[in-house]
Amino acid sequence: MDCDIFLVGLNHRTAGVDVRERFALANHCDEEHWALPCTGAVSESIILSTCNRVEILAAGTGEVAEQVLRNWAGARKSDVEDLRPYVYVHKNLEAVRHLFSVASSLDSMVLGEPQILGQLKTAYRKAVKSRATGVILNRLLHKAFSVAKRVRTETAVASSAVSISYAAVELAKRIFGDMRAHKAMLVGAGEMAELAAMHLLQAGIADILVANRTLVRGQELAKQFNGHAIPFEDMPRHLLDVDIIITSTGSQEPIIRARDIRAALKIRKNRPMFFIDIAVPRDIDPDVNGLDNVYLYDIDDLKEVVEENLATRRDEAAKAAEIVNEEVVQFSRWLASLDMQPTIVDLIKKGQRAAEEELAKTLKRLGPVDDNTREALEAMAGALVRKLNHDPIMFLKHGGMSQEGNGPRISIMRRIFNLDKTGCIYSEEN
């Protein structure tokens, strides 16, 4: 393979929510894509930016990881050295393994949750639309999707998985106990909000408000759960009516300020308010934490609820990891074939030319022969070429791809079989 695959990223393990929101790229994918493709070291790239991770998958030659870091930091108007301490870099097979694990939800905060696969598919569609992908990443992403499907089909890793939204509602139940007497508001109307609405209903809350920048989408979600949609700009004055607020927008700035909540608390006579901010960047001003009778949790605070649900799926995760490893090996063979294919083709052609030359000399010595004899000789020559080429081709194909690449093995094969010289294979003197 003439280029390498890199995965550069940070996630909920390497960076807190404050860092993740600082370097989030969710709103930068469409408009810029940082001009990564076809510039410098990078030839293909895909950006995955969610509440729990920002990862850039790139293919190219040379200083790919450094270029990705520079463009990433530049897109967020930050210094690359501020980003570097939180970042991991995977190369080639380790990048492939990590991507397969992410797609299969083995690297998620919520092991087995289904949202990440949809988010990855969306990221891929955006990259394709931006013409940022090519042969390598197209093949890799489609393989990742099939690996995720195989993991879900052959293991029970997702059978009892909780979503972030489920964890948020569970946390609310710990604060309020009986949820039936309380009202809730969802700020945002995406997949997270839809899941939250479902879990709120199951917990006993029948009165749900939905505030969304696009009122029509808010109305669609509210209709599904017999709720009420409100204009986004009216959201602050409705804070006094609700006890539980779950936010999940894509805003780059806080949309709920401490002053808004302070005003609501006065009218509510300090009745408790419970906020769960599952957006990255965060939707709620962190200063809200300083207010009495206000419980504010962000996405990192949900880990305890998630951990309680994890034990039952660890054995299944081990089975899923085995599937990932098998698929990495399979993909490595395809990768290896990319740079080995020219050598394999040259080897086959050289064998065919040698067979044709020797067959021509043999037929000349034999003189006129019937068609059956000619066909038998041609078949024998072809069979000999295939048998003689079998072991060298297997050596090339099944060596897999190492961190050092396949160059040394290809170079040896080309030297042994003298593939870089043209002309006749054998002369009369041979």
Swiss-Prot record:
Possesses an unusual extended V-shaped dimeric structure with each monomer consisting of three distinct domains arranged along a curved 'spinal' alpha-helix. The N-terminal catalytic domain specifically recognizes the glutamate moiety of the substrate. The second domain is the NADPH-binding domain, and the third C-terminal domain is responsible for dimerization. Keywords: NADP, Oxidoreductase, Porphyrin biosynthesis. The keyword NADP applies. The active site is at C51 (nucleophile). PANTHER family: GLUTAMYL-TRNA REDUCTASE. It comes from Desulfovibrio desulfuricans (strain ATCC 27774 / DSM 6949 / MB). This is Glutamyl-tRNA reductase. Homodimer. During catalysis, the active site Cys acts as a nucleophile attacking the alpha-carbonyl group of tRNA-bound glutamate with the formation of a thioester intermediate between enzyme and glutamate, and the concomitant release of tRNA(Glu). The thioester intermediate is finally reduced by direct hydride transfer from NADPH, to form the product GSA. Substrate binds at T50, C51, N52, R53, S108, E113, P114, Q115, Q119.
